[in-house]
Amino acid sequence: MIDLHAHILPNVDDGSNSLEDSLQMLLEAQEQGVTDIVLTPHHRRKFCKTKQELLAEFKSFCLEKEKRGLNVNLYLGQEIYIDSNYKSLVTSDKILTLCDSNYVLVEFDFVEEADITEVVYGLNKLGFKPIVAHFERYTYATIDMAKEVKSLGGLIQVNAQSLVGKGKFHFRKMTKALFKQNLVDFVASDMHLGRINCMKKAYAFVSKKYSKQTADNVFELNAKRFIKG
């Protein structure tokens, strides 16, 4: 499996506060059957490490991963919080796309309604492929909105915990509705320290309830569009 949304890089956001915690999270991912992870530290408010700082942290973490013999391929990106300045931000070379591709992982305010479709349209016009992170978690999200996101060239990611974890009922309901309408492009862990990695369980759930091909697509094959190496 390929996990394209994970906060495992240590000491850069709210995902992990130590190298040891991050290495343990990598081990757990490996045990879940994850072979490739895109590390996606936040770019929002107080979490605004520079591109150069993140690249340095990533290089160091990869070396530590090799020392521990962990067999997971690592890549770098960011989860970008969208505000009114998003166009100047994404074109400024200050943020990281996923695996140095034109795919960008974007998130919005969970409660205050954002114009997700307008942002998707704007990013697409700028030459980016926007992936809306954890679409099911936005309280104002609807199936019609998801359909419009897709029609405008956007992609939809949901969290594994929203399928099989102990998340809020709304998250589970929306995630299953998205699957029923064939609107999900990616399932990812959105791992933070303290969260249970349930990628294996979520894969089994999707494979059984929908189809193995659907599970293969959303847990691996679709992400191969931008994974390099």
Language-model-derived ranges and their functions:
Residues 30, 124, 179-180:
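Non-catalytic positions within long, well-ordered alpha-helices that form the structural scaffold/packing
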Residues 21-25, 57-64, 119, 145, ...:
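A general structural detector for well-ordered alpha-helical segments in enzyme core domains, enriched
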Residues 48-157:
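Extended substrate/RNA-proximal surfaces in nucleic-acid metabolism proteins
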